[in-house]
Amino acid sequence: MKQYNDLFKIIHREGYIFIASFALVSFLLASFNEKLGCIGCIATAWCIYFFRNPDRFVPISDDLVISPADGIIQEIKEALPPPELGLGDVEMIRVSIFLNIFNVHVNRIPANGKILALHYNPGKFFNASLDKASIYNERQSVLMETAQGQKIVFVQIAGLIARRIVCDLEEGNEVKTGERYGIIRFGSRVDVYLPLKTALLVSKGQTAIGGETIIADFGRKKTTEFKFERK
């Protein structure tokens, strides 16, 4: 029984219906044409790969902000946070992480703290690699207060192909760094907004690993010690 539970654990539940559908179509195609059946099996295997949900070794410290997603650090700039969160016209550092269709799409909590507000904003579906995607695309914005009292924002953004954002958080949730909280299907972007004086530990073009890569350290001016936990 444990083996079956472990199997389902490594696949995100959002993928179950897709995998089952692909497998059924593959079976039907194979009954008519062997080559079509092979193509269907390849598509099913890719679907399983897309919805993979691997464990990560998460650095644990109240000072740290970790990447909420796998992908490329596409942009780091000063920008206003999503207006729907009511933070006013105070610019923050925005770290944008672009996910292609081959990245793990499960999203993770970037820091220890409490969820203060959530807001879903329906929008367009521009290519998530474009700067305007942060403003105009469909998004799910989350405001949290870290254990150190810092307010940070993380935003799931739909892309050209991604048409489904899943966020399992609720206002008032106490959350831990690296916990899984949602997924964006089929290519997307995640933005993280941090206070302007935050010490960043990533650079543009760097590959980020969700739940592992340290984006920033609020205690950078002092020696920060932390441990790792598998999640």
UniProtKB/Swiss-Prot annotation:
Heterodimer of a large membrane-associated beta subunit and a small pyruvoyl-containing alpha subunit. Belongs to the phosphatidylserine decarboxylase family. PSD-A subfamily. Its main location: membrane. This is Phosphatidylserine decarboxylase proenzyme. One of its GO terms (cellular component) is plasma membrane. The lineage of its organism: Bacteria, Pseudomonadati, Pseudomonadota, Alphaproteobacteria, Rickettsiales. It comes from the Bacteria. Binds 1 pyruvoyl group covalently per subunit. It catalyses: a 1,2-diacyl-sn-glycero-3-phospho-L-serine + H(+) = a 1,2-diacyl-sn-glycero-3-phosphoethanolamine + CO2. The gene is psd. It comes from Rickettsia africae (strain ESF-5). Its EC number is 4.1.1.65. GO terms for biological process: phosphatidylethanolamine biosynthetic process. It is a peripheral membrane protein. The active site is at S188 (schiff-base intermediate with substrate).
